Regions:
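Alpha-helical interface subdomain recognition
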Residues: 1-87, 94, 107-112, 119, ...
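Glycine-rich phosphate/pyrophosphate-binding beta-alpha loops
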Residues: 97, 137, 162-167, 207, ...
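A short, Trp-centered hydrophobic/proline-enriched beta-strand micro-motif
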Residues: 123-132
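Hydrophobic, small-residue-rich alpha-helical packing segments that form membrane-like cores
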Residues: 136-140, 155
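Flexible, small-/acidic-enriched active-site or ligand-binding loops
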Residues: 143, 194-224
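A short core secondary-structure module
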Residues: 145, 158-199
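A short, charged helix-loop
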Residues: 214-241
Length: 384
């Protein structure tokens, strides 16, 4: 029997996260260090320091003083963190770091954990997952063009990646490359290693990730044997470990943003008058808010259901695909209706809603566009 009862302890943690984001993080949303390419490193460090002081930093990773939480519990807390796009940044549960911490926690050896994972968990450095390429390796990673060749006891990597989130300034790098004779392989190295070239930061419609999204070139990147992450040729299998949880945490965070956008739209509908009464009393507005509330609750329950599947020890690939496809599409509709309810204010930066609209539009592509998930779902249905 599925039971989504929120315990008093979980409710208290949720309320603490929500209060922290509302009281400490939201005031930074209009900070000049919020750039067209996302928050600067300086702003991120200041926010992380606040979360560390509050005892809430990286709450999703179990360690001394931080208890383990289930995927369902994570969903409750991540939604609270998503009240502001800067909330996950401050709390160190934003992409790509959150997914990278999960992956490294599964396959990194003790030395790699100490050097590359622990500093990310502690909020002292950021990480990247360098897979996506301009030639197509993204939704179809088997088109991987970045190569790795053996060089004595080590490796040499060459290739170009793009849309690499947070690359500029990140120190923990997970790189996927096609290793001669073995296939897709993961490597782990420091971002300051010679041969990693940040060509440029791309101009994208979203701006909620530190340092934005970059084009990266690997120019004879020499790595030692110790840079191998896991086993040779196992990158796709390892990526699957990260896949379902990362899809769902994206959904959790954006759900929090949708709840806030709905709250702003509701406040406006109660106070803005037109034709002799508050606009929310006009069906054209009220029905949009009702549709939003229905969609938000549907998304929440689907996320919790998929998380429950993971908590039963299942991989949840099918369930996470369905959830990611539905939630990304429905939350975009929620954002669009909030913009419509707000009218002219909705297309401005007078509220966070326009920014949420831009960000959640990009979410329909992150971790696989909707159509790729629909194809995977249909393939399984027809196979079974």
């Amino acid at each position: 029997m599925i039971d989504f009862t929120i315990t008093p302890e979980l409710a208290a943690r949720r309320d603490a996260v929500r209060a922290f984001v509302a009281d400490k993080v939201v005031p930074f949303e209009n900070d000049p260090r919020m750039t067209a390419h996302g928050p600067t490193e300086e702003l991120r460090d200041e926010l992380v320091a606040l979360a560390r002081e509050a005892g809430l930093l990286t709450f999703q990773v179990a360690r001394a003083g931080v208890p383990a939480i289930s995927h369902v519990e994570q969903a409750v807390l991540f939604e609270a963190a998503g009240w502001s796009s800067l909330g996950p940044v401050a709390l160190n549960c934003a992409a790509p770091d959150e997914g990278n911490m999960f992956l490294l926690g599964k396959i990194a050896n003790p030395q790699q954990t100490k050097e590359f994972l622990d500093p990310v968990v502690e909020g002292h450095q950021r990480s990247v997952f360098a897979m996506t390429e301009p030639g197509g390796a993204g939704s179809d990673p088997r088109q991987l063009a970045t190569t790795a060749v053996r060089d004595g006891d080590g490796y040499v990597i060459n290739g170009v990646k793009w849309l690499i989130t947070g690359a500029n300034g990140a120190r923990t790098w997970i790189i996927m490359a096609d290793l001669e004779g073995a296939g897709a392989t993961l490597f782990l190295c420091d971002g300051d290693t010679p041969g990693i070239v940040i060509e440029r930061t791309m101009d994208t419609m979203d701006r909620n990730y530190v340092a934005g999204h970059c084009v990266v070139r690997f120019d004879d990147l020499h790595l030692p044997a110790s840079a191998l992450l896991g086993e040779e040729g196992e990158a796709f299998r390892y990526a699957q470990l990260r896949l379902a949880p990362a899809r769902l945490t994206h959904c959790m965070r954006w759900l929090g943003g949708a709840v806030r956008a709905q709250s702003i739209a509701l406040d406006h509908a109660r106070t803005r008058t037109a034709f002799g009464k508050p606009i929310g009393q006009h069906q054209g507005v009220g029905f949009q808010l009702a549709d939003n509330e229905i969609a938000i609750q549907q998304c929440r329950l689907m996320i919790w259901w998929a998380c429950w599947v993971l908590d039963q020890g299942q991989q949840g690939r099918h369930e996470s695909s369905m959830t990611k496809a539905m939630v990304s599409e429905e939350l975009f509709k929620v954002a669009d209706r909030c913009v419509q309810v707000l009218g002219g204010m909705g297309i401005s930066d007078e509220t966070p809603v326009a920014g949420f609209f831009r960000d959640v539009r990009a979410f329909r592509l992150y971790d696989g566009p909707t159509e790729v998930h629909q194809h995977a779902i249909a393939t399984r249905l027809l196979r079974d």
